[in-house]
């Protein structure tokens, strides 16, 4: 079997927690921020766990991470 290629775009966006869960940043924090409330912008800073429905796809794209 040949080596599997890592999806580099996704590898730059995902980190793995100590317990093995995949972490990602929230979208919507780059521009057009004046129309968003402080609370909304503050909550967009947080990292979240990748949803269980997407974990299988992430594992396939990141075979060695």
Curated annotation (Swiss-Prot):
Record's keyword annotation contains Transit peptide: no
Gene3D superfamilies documented for this protein: 4.10.410.60
Gene Ontology CC annotation, any one: large ribosomal subunit
Keywords from the UniProt entry: Ribonucleoprotein, Ribosomal protein
Domain of life: Bacteria
Record-level Gene Ontology MF annotations: structural constituent of ribosome
UniProt entry tagged with the keyword Transferase: no
Biological process annotations from GO: translation
InterPro entries per record: Ribosomal_bL35, Ribosomal_bL35-like, Ribosomal_bL35_CS, Ribosomal_bL35_sf
NCBIfam families referenced in this protein's UniProt entry, alphabetically: rpmI_bact
PANTHER family: 54S RIBOSOMAL PROTEIN BL35M, LARGE RIBOSOMAL SUBUNIT PROTEIN BL35M
UniProt record similarity statement: Belongs to the bacterial ribosomal protein bL35 family.
UniProt protein name: Large ribosomal subunit protein bL35
Gene giving rise to this polypeptide: rpmI
């Amino acid at each position: 079997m040949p080596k599997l290629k890592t999806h580099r775009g996704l590898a730059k966006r995902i980190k793995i927690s100590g317990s093995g869960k995949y972490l990602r940043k929230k979208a919507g924090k780059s521009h057009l921020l004046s129309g968003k409330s402080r609370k909304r912008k503050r909550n967009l800073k947080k990292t979240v766990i990748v949803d269980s429905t997407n974990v299988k796809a992430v594992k396939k794209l990141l075979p060695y991470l």
